[in-house]
Amino acid sequence: MDIRNEPFIDYLEDTEIIINCVPGFMGFETSKKILEKKTCVDISFMPEDCNELNTIAKEAETALYPDAGVAPGLSNIIVGNLITKQEIDEIKIMVGGLPIEKKPPWNYKAPFSPIDVIEEYTRPARIKKNGIIETVKPLTGLI
C-alpha cells in the first residue's frame, strides 16, 4: 500500500488508535491524515512543528502523541498497559541496531528507517539548557 497515494485510513476503520511508524520525512503528512479520523501515536521524529496539527485533532476530536519513540517510548507504554492487566514478575525490553552476527561494512542493523538513523546524527538537535530550549549542531557537547 502506498500511503502517500491511497486512502489507507479507510482500511483502519475498526481501530481506535493508529501508531505511525513511517520514516520521519513522511511523518507529518501521515499523522495529518490519521488525525482526521483517528488518534495517532507517532514514534518517529518529524522535522515539522507537530503543534500545527492541533487544530485538525481538536476539530476531529482525536489526539496526537508525537515523537513517542520506540524504547524508551512505545515499548514502555505497552509494558505499562500489560502491568495494569496482569501480574508480571520481569520484563526485558530489547531494541537496538547492534546485531549478534555483524555483517560488514556497517556491522549495524537499522531497527527502523536507515534515513532516520543517519539523520539522528546529522540534523540539528533541540536541547533544554537552563530551562531554555535551544537548537544546536548535531552531537554538540558529546564529541
Question: Which residue stretches match the model-derived regions?
Answer:
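Short acidic/histidine-rich motifs immediately flanking catalytic phosphotransfer sites
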Residues: 12-18, 35-40
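Alpha-helical segments flanking ligand/cofactor-binding loops in enzyme cores
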Residues: 10, 29-32, 55
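Oxidoreductase and adenylate-handling cofactor-binding alpha/beta cores
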Residues: 73-91
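Short, acidic/turn-prone active-site loops that include or flank metal/cofactor-
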Residues: 3, 24, 44-50, 69-71
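Rossmann-fold NAD(P)-binding glycine/threonine-rich loop
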Residues: 43-66
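Active-site-lining helix/loop region of Rossmann-like oxidoreductase modules
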Residues: 86-143
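Conserved Rossmann-fold cofactor-binding substructure of NAD(P)-dependent oxidoreductases
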Residues: 2-14, 26
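Beta-loop-alpha module in the N-terminal Rossmann-like domain of NAD(P)-dependent dehydrogenases
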Residues: 17-33, 47-49
